[in-house]
């Protein structure tokens, strides 16, 4: 009789242990699922925040931006129609162990319907030398870049006058095709980052390879960065980076941004 009681007690304890372990595993799975849902939610919010501008891509004629309204908040003065800032640069590691980047920034003032900016060539060195920075003033008329400074280098002059922003040929309307991103958030800034693997079959990747010297077959990573409120902010900014880097000290990427802010004075001197 005592033997049966002991066995019943052992079985009760055993079943209790199984129940406790099962509950704990269930809670762990629930927490994991909640965390996944939270990450997915932020991923979708980041995508939606970018979609507001990326849905306009490709903007083959940049003068269309004069008639495009962006996100407005209390930073805008009464009557200010605002200004679009479009930016693209190509950055790569150089032989000096530093970084070279070349590109253009253009400020399109919706009040005056004028576009001014500059083409830049920058070289950053690894040790003991200040970076070299050269800016060449440009303006845009009839959707054509006009070089305002004298440039002796015929190849550089040609690159400036024929320059196209990423936003003029990119098509990122199907952001939903980029899934399972690596999302990181800094609530203190706030800032939001998402990374998505791209394919070499992607038309945007093919476009970049046809326009820039990209000596690697490695498929790039699409990086999305937001500073400021996800819903929109004239004091924050958003940028895209298509990163072809091999890792380590190798840098090879194209950076693009299109932001809307209150109109400024002497934008091309910034």
Swiss-Prot record:
Membrane topology designation: Lipid-anchor
Covalently attached lipid (S-diacylglycerol cysteine), positions: 23
Lipidation (N-palmitoyl cysteine): 23
Main subcellular localisation: membrane
Keywords for the protein's UniProt record, in alphabetical order: Cell membrane, Lipoprotein, Membrane, Palmitate, Signal
InterPro entries named among the record's database cross-references: Csa (IPR007595), Csa_sf (IPR038641)
Subcellular location: Cell membrane
Signal sequence segment: 1-22
Entry protein name: Uncharacterized lipoprotein SAUSA300_0417
UniProt source species: Staphylococcus aureus (strain USA300)
């Amino acid at each position: 009789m005592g033997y049966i009681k002991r066995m019943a007690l052992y079985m009760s304890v055993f079943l209790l242990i199984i129940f406790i372990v099962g509950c704990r595993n269930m809670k762990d799975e629930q927490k994991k699922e909640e965390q996944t849902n939270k990450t997915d939610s932020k991923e979708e919010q980041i995508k939606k925040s970018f979609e507001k501008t990326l849905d306009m891509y490709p903007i083959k004629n940049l003068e269309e931006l004069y008639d495009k309204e962006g996100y407005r908040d209390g930073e805008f003065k009464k009557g200010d129609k605002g200004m679009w800032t479009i930016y693209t640069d190509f950055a790569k590691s150089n032989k000096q162990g530093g970084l070279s980047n070349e590109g253009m920034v253009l400020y399109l003032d919706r009040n005056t319907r004028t576009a001014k900016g500059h083409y830049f060539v920058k070289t950053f060195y690894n040790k003991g030398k200040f970076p070299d920075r050269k800016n060449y003033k440009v303006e845009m008329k009839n959707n054509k870049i006009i070089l305002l400074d004298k440039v002796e280098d015929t190849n550089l002059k040609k690159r400036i006058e024929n320059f196209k922003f990423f936003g003029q040929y990119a098509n990122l309307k199907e952001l939903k095709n980029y899934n399972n991103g690596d999302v990181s958030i800094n609530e203190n800034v706030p800032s939001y980052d998402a990374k998505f693997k791209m394919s070499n079959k992607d038309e945007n990747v093919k476009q970049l390879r046809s326009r820039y010297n990209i000596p690697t077959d490695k498929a790039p990573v699409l990086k999305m960065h937001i500073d400021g409120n996800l819903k929109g902010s004239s004091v924050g900014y958003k940028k895209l980076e298509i990163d072809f880097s091999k890792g380590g000290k190798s840098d090879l990427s194209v950076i693009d941004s299109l932001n809307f802010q209150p109109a400024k004075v002497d934008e091309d001197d910034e």
